[in-house]
Swiss-Prot record:
Cofactor(s), by name: Zn(2+)
The gene coding this protein: nrdR
Name of the protein in its database record: Transcriptional repressor NrdR
Alphabetically ordered keywords of this record: ATP-binding, DNA-binding, Metal-binding, Nucleotide-binding, Repressor, Transcription, Transcription regulation, Zinc, Zinc-finger
Family: Belongs to the NrdR family.
Lineage of the organism: Bacteria, Pseudomonadati, Chlamydiota, Chlamydiia, Parachlamydiales
Keyword check for Zinc-finger: yes
């Protein structure tokens, strides 16, 4: 690696720590020639291929996942940091599964599973785009599904209290 300021190849790592929200290692480096400091990020290259709806494939891109989740979570109780953390968690799940390919359908289902436990509004917003509801009936069905799961949680909490 070369210094971005003077192009000298002699560098020293002065600090190294995990940047968990980015699935990376953050390193502070110092040039041994000009003594300027800069930061680098070391990331794992995830080589999962995503099969799109039209049948084509592209490399998994975490920023696309973040953008989709952020759009669904806009104006909800979920912060941008939580969106980044959720995307990192999903990326970790992909890496641990050691799969080579995943469809956008599978990614969408994975995102919906996580969103459902975080915020029902974000879940419905994501579902509207991901499932491409054709009419209000399909939207109503999705809302009923999430309401019944919330009621099941409430009932189990009440049973535990009694």
């Amino acid at each position: 690696m070369r210094c971005p300021f003077c192009q000298f190849e002699g560098l020293k790592v002065t600090d190294s720590r995990d940047a968990m929200e980015m699935n990376a290692i953050r390193r502070r480096r110092e040039c041994l020639n000009c003594l300027k400091r800069f930061t680098t990020f070391e990331t794992i290259e995830l080589t999962v291929q995503v099969q799109k709806r039209d049948g084509t494939y592209e490399d998994f891109q975490q920023h696309k996942l973040i953008n989709g989740l952020a759009a669904a979570c806009r104006h909800t109780k979920i912060s941008h940091d939580q969106v980044i953390s959720l995307a990192a968690q999903m990326t970790n799940e992909l890496m641990q599964s050691q799969i080579q390919q995943i469809s956008t359908t599978q990614l969408g289902e994975m995102a919906m599973k996580h969103l459902q436990s975080l915020d029902p509004i974000a879940y419905i917003r994501f579902a509207c785009v991901y499932k491409r509801f054709k009419d209000l009936g399909e939207l109503e069905e999705a809302i009923k599904t999430i309401q019944s799961k919330d009621e099941d949680k409430s009932c189990s909490i009440l049973k535990d209290l009694l």
